Amino acid sequence: MVRTEFNKIWSNYFHKEYATLVENGKTAIFEALKILNSEHVALPTYTCHRVLQACLDAGVTPYIVDCGLNLQIDVSKIPIEVDTVIVPHMFGIQADVKSLSGFRVIEDCSQCIGLPDLGKYSDIVIASTGPTKWLNVGEDKEKGGGIIAHNSPFYKESLYNENIAKKLNQMYLEIPNILESRINKASEFINAGIDLIGSDQPNAWLRALYFGSQKRIPYTPLHDRYPGFSCPVVDSYKNKLDWISIFP
């Protein structure tokens, strides 16, 4: 019953035929790359290092791409060799997935539950459900769970945790309330004169970035970890950004 409800809720939510649980978000990306038979994969420099690690584990060639001023992947910088693009909606700011129609697209929705049309323009949706994520089920960091939503009838579920599935089904009902709470919290900062990056765009407010003095930017850009790629926009942001966690 719980399993059937989980598949129905999350496959519909992400505009896919199937939704299954995996061990964590990194595993979800690894599995998505295998489903799509990806070989040359673009991903933004500004995202969690586990996204890059999933690419390396899957044996694909990664292309680390600069971001725009809102810290979402700059579609115009994607190399012609690429067949697949991993698109996270960083900090809950909606990336332009619709513009990627010429590629296979893995949409990372770990930080953006509550935004419109999630999964509508991508081939596969993944989401981490571990600590600090929008869908935080309170499990440990390594095995906190992940969702992969797809259209492949041949994909075999590698993990099913009824406790996590039940929590996610319950959280689905709370999405409007959680989103409203996050937006209200972000509005307090905006009203206090803090200029949050991406505040003029659709935003699910997992975290908010602004120009500040604390220099607590939450991710090391991937091109610093995996040299050979030029990302001047993100480089220009180094040591200039601060961030706020926005929780209900």
Enumerate the predicted regions with their spans.
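A structural motif shared across PLP-dependent enzymes of the aminotransferase-like
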Residues: M1-K8
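Active-site phosphate-binding strand-loop segment of PLP-dependent enzymes
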Residues: G68-F154
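PLP-dependent aminotransferase class I/II
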Residues: K8-E17, G25, I86-V87, S152-P248
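Short loop-beta-helix segment that forms the pyridoxal 5′-phosphate
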Residues: K8-E31, L43-P44, D66-C67
